[in-house]
Amino acid sequence: MTAPHTPSRRDETLGLWLGVLGVAIFAITLPATRLATGSAQAPQLSPWFVTVGRAALAGLLSAAFLLATRSPRPQQAQWKHLGWAVLGNVIGYPLLLGYALRSVTASHAAVVTALLPLVTAAVAALVLHQRARLGFWACAVLGSVLVVAFSLLRGGQQGHGFGFETADLLLVGAVVAASVGYIHGARVTPALGAERVICWMCLMALPFTLPAALWLWPAQPVAPSAWAGFVYVGVFSMWAGFFAWFRGLALGGALRVSQTQLLQPFFSILASIPLLGEPLDVVTLGFAAAVVATVVVGKKLS
């Protein structure tokens, strides 16, 4: 009888750094998407084009990877979960995020999307009928209250009155969409392998995303910075980042490496300073830290 494999110290260290790399890649998604779509005052690429275009780019890369590795096709029962993952992660999250980032800063979005790990756990509890402790739900409610308070505060500061911005509702929708996609993707990961799940998702969507991207190709000139943001979210956010992230989880252990997700909102805020010229806002940092704290405590109580 062989002993179960345990990661070596070297694997744990490499896995941790790969996890940090993956989180950093995902964190830059917010400012890169803002670069690609522009603002309401100076729009660049349409959110629909960015959504289908980034997925098409990742789909072409995925096709090459799956062919090169001679990956077997998913079984019939697995396509349903891949389809839900496509709707949540390939279409829903980037589309809602793209529209939201035309109205709010990337730093603002980082605070709202910091709830993603907690919402994912809540969706898992509801969809997979997993029981969670009362303390977990208390943290989920507290984290949601913090996000609501932040959104109301920002609305008042911008002269819109104390009420939700449409962008805040879009961001919440994006978080829910991503969470649903993550849960369904996770259900087929043990059988397919983590890297292949994202590849099959992108390839599954390619018959729709590639023609749609060509149809929606911008007719007007677009700033080079917008194209740079688009290429980033297609190559890195939608594809390469998952390779670093999943490999890090495998090498360093999912429990340990997944904690690096807590750095993501801070990486997003910091990346927005040089990429978008957004100021370092103490209030935004404070709310981000508070939301992350609810995620930390919530995970311990789940």
Where are these regions (language model features)?
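Membrane-interface helix termini and inter-helical loops of multi-pass transporters
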Residues: 31-44, 102, 151-164, 213-230, ...
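Glycine-/small-residue-enriched transmembrane alpha-helix faces in small-molecule transporters
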Residues: 1-52, 158-187, 208
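Transmembrane alpha-helical core positions of polytopic small-molecule transporters
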Residues: 23-27, 58, 85-94, 116-117, ...
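Cytoplasmic-side transmembrane-helix entry/capping segments in multi-pass membrane proteins
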Residues: 16-19, 77-86, 132-144, 192-201, ...
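Specific transmembrane alpha-helical segments of multi-pass solute transporters/efflux pumps
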Residues: 25-30, 66-113, 149, 234-252
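Specific alpha-helical transmembrane segments that line the substrate/conduction pathway
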Residues: 49-60, 88-89, 97-131, 135, ...
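Hydrophobic transmembrane alpha-helices of multi-pass small-molecule transport proteins
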Residues: 62, 123, 132-154, 271, ...
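Transmembrane alpha-helices of multi-pass small-molecule transport proteins
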Residues: 42-92, 119-123, 142, 176-184, ...
